[in-house]
């Protein structure tokens, strides 16, 4: 006790008793505090355990619009928009399979939700998924951020739910109507903004020969080629793909996916 309160002679026996009593009271206070705190700490642990687990955030990707292929050398990216369609998507899938080509399917959310078996078939065949919004509004770039938010993320959920959990890896704005906000939003949710270099113009109603000629003439523009499997009668698209894919191989092209 001398070390804490001075000399033992100053306090004598009384000082010793007081010191012991003080120490005992202090010890009881510590024990009491520990006992009182224990239930609260346990309750906090239980409450934390009861909180729903937060889903892991998808790793963000580059927000710039990609055109390049992930395959080195002379390579093309085949992209298919506006489906899935119960008539034309299976036919497009068959042509791709016959030619050993993988593609990226840019799907409209409600179409994916309406045809989940087709979405799963696309994934099972080794193709990749792309978000093409809920309503395919080509004036997206003139709409407010909250509208773009719903269009992009609601479609993403519809497609992934239909796919059984497969990830949507790209976002293509309808008509190319990207904004800085939509590109960053998509990228923050793991979807690389996806452009195109070659527009087959198959949606304009031209002949198969016109589609072929357009694609052949524009391949020098870059590797990402745009076709459609939804939004109308795509018989000409299917036939054009049947002709173009073997021709592309004869020209020495390989096939990859857009870079992530």
List where the protein language model places each region.
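A cross-family glycoside hydrolase active-site/sugar-binding cleft signature
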Residues: 79, 104-108, 130-132, 172-174, ...
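CE4/NodB-like, metal-dependent polysaccharide N-deacetylase domain
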Residues: 93-104, 128, 145-176, 184-187, ...
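His/Asp/Glu-enriched short active-site or ligand-binding loop at hydrolase and phosphoryl-transfer sites
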Residues: 177-218, 252-260
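Active-site beta->alpha N-cap acidic-glycine motif
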Residues: 50-143, 147, 151-158, 168
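Signal peptide-directed secreted proteins
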Residues: 205-256
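Short histidine/acidic/glycine/proline-rich micro-motifs that form metal-
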Residues: 109-112, 135-138, 174-177, 199-202, ...
């Amino acid at each position: 006790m001398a070390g804490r309160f001075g000399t033992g002679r100053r306090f004598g026996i009384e000082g010793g008793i007081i010191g012991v009593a003080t120490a005992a009271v202090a010890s009881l206070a510590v024990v009491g505090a520990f006992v009182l705190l224990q239930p609260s700490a346990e309750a906090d642990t239980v409450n934390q355990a009861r909180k729903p687990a937060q889903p892991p955030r998808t790793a963000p990707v580059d927000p710039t619009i990609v055109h390049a292929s992930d395959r080195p050398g002379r390579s093309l990216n085949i992209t298919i928009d506006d489906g899935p369609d119960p008539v034309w998507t299976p036919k497009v899938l068959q042509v791709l399979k016959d030619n050993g080509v993988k593609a990226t399917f840019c799907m409209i959310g409600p179409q994916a939700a309406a045809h989940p078996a087709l979405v799963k078939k696309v994934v099972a065949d080794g193709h990749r998924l792309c978000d093409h919004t809920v309503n395919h509004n080509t004036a997206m770039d003139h709409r407010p951020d909250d509208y773009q938010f719903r269009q992009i993320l609601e479609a993403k959920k519809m497609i992934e739910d239909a796919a059984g959990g497969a990830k949507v890896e790209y976002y293509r704005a309808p008509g190319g109507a990207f904004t800085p906000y939509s590109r960053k939003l998509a990228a923050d949710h793991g979807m690389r903004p996806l452009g195109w270099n070659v527009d087959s113009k198959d949606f304009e109603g031209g002949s198969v020969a016109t589609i072929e000629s357009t694609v052949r003439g524009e391949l020098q523009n870059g590797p990402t080629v745009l076709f459609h499997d939804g939004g109308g009668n795509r018989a000409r698209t299917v036939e054009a793909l049947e002709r173009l894919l073997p021709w592309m191989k004869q020209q020495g092209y390989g096939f990859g996916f857009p870079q992530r």
